[in-house]
Amino acid sequence: NAPRPSKIVKLSLEKMGMNKEIRENVYSSGEAALSYLKKNLLNKNFYHLGPPKDFDLFLDFKENKTSSIEESSYLLCTGLFEKQSEDLNYYKELLKESINKKMICTNPDLLVDKGDKRELCAGSVALIFEKMGGKVLYFGKPFPEVYNQAINNEGKKVLSIGDNLNTDIKGANLLNYDSLIISNGVHKDEIKKEGIDVVSKKYETV
């Protein structure tokens, strides 16, 4: 789950030292969303929720980005604004008059750990919008569309590896894939305290 095109994600992985043979097969949630947007909403004005680092997602149709949420046809959520990265109440106020618009969420993750810092992701904003009565179209794990676009799994065995029970493991279970949980990730404190069986049931992954 990354709210940017696959080519941008591959560059990041290259800088991290990932083997070329592996990273060439990377497919991002942003790429899945981009495919949908180009087919269905290419000429529509949109309001972007997210930081400037995600602008690569809509470079091909950046002229349709509007700074006025009232003038937008749909909402494109890639994350949180840099100056409003922790206060979800800000988004409740911002979105309350746009419940009739569709939101495209390019990263269903609710949160991510970056080093010792925990950050909110696009999924947290999308969840608030849904609870307010809005409609959200998700791209990324655990939703099937990203798997359908990324994997030709006919006759193949698939192993889904990740640290997030809400997305990585839930997505694998929905599609009947084998999965491997990285226990030293976002749920590490819960798993250490309660055990994986209890925690996985709490997140309704099984």
Task: Show where each model-derived region lies.
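Asp-based, Mg2+/Mn2+-dependent phosphohydrolase catalytic module
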Residues: 2-206
